[in-house]
Amino acid sequence: MNLKDYIATIPNYPKEGIEFRDISPLMADGNAYSYAVREIVQYATDKQIDMIVGPEARGFIVGCPVAFELGIGFAPVRKPGKLPREVISADYEKEYGVDTLTMHADAIKPGQRVLIVDDLLATGGTVKATIEMIEKLGGIVAGCAFLIELDDLKGREAIGDYDYKVLMHY
């Protein structure tokens, strides 16, 4: 199945010069959505994953069904002020400044093998901050999986030597 057939490209959104890759058509098609989830599940199968971690919001959309299929838990990564209990945080650089991500301080147990799942790998700031928090909690990042990678933005460099899987390249 060619998953790119289920990605809408929106020119000049959210600002001039950006081509936004919209995964909504993929999610709206049960066969395409299921296929994408199964591809990530297949990638995770041999990695002995204990927990899926997904950044808000589209990491939830992709990560939760993967966790369900694997029969394991899911831990959300959120912006500050969105999680109700004690959190840890990591800052990451954006095009015009610094942003912060958080996760519950008890989300990952030391030694747990974690797969980070998100819809998009762009500059890599989100995944780099997520890796930092997982490792701060003693987790082992066993891999990262993305629906889409925007190759020109070189997010792969932020991942370093961590194993990763991408279903579509743009």
Swiss-Prot record:
Its main location: cytoplasm. Transmembrane segments: none annotated. SUPFAM superfamilies: PRTase-like. Keywords: Cytoplasm, Glycosyltransferase, Purine salvage, Transferase. GO terms for cellular component: cytoplasm. Pathway: Purine metabolism; AMP biosynthesis via salvage pathway; AMP from adenine: step 1/1. It is found in: Cytoplasm. One of its GO terms (molecular function) is adenine phosphoribosyltransferase activity. Its EC number is 2.4.2.7. Coiled coil: none annotated. One of its GO terms (biological process) is adenine salvage. It catalyses: AMP + diphosphate = 5-phospho-alpha-D-ribose 1-diphosphate + adenine. The keyword Aminoacyl-tRNA synthetase does not apply. The keyword Transport does not apply. Homodimer. Belongs to the purine/pyrimidine phosphoribosyltransferase family. Catalyzes a salvage reaction resulting in the formation of AMP, that is energically less costly than de novo synthesis. PANTHER family: ADENINE PHOSPHORIBOSYLTRANSFERASE. This is Adenine phosphoribosyltransferase. It comes from Streptococcus suis (strain 05ZYH33).
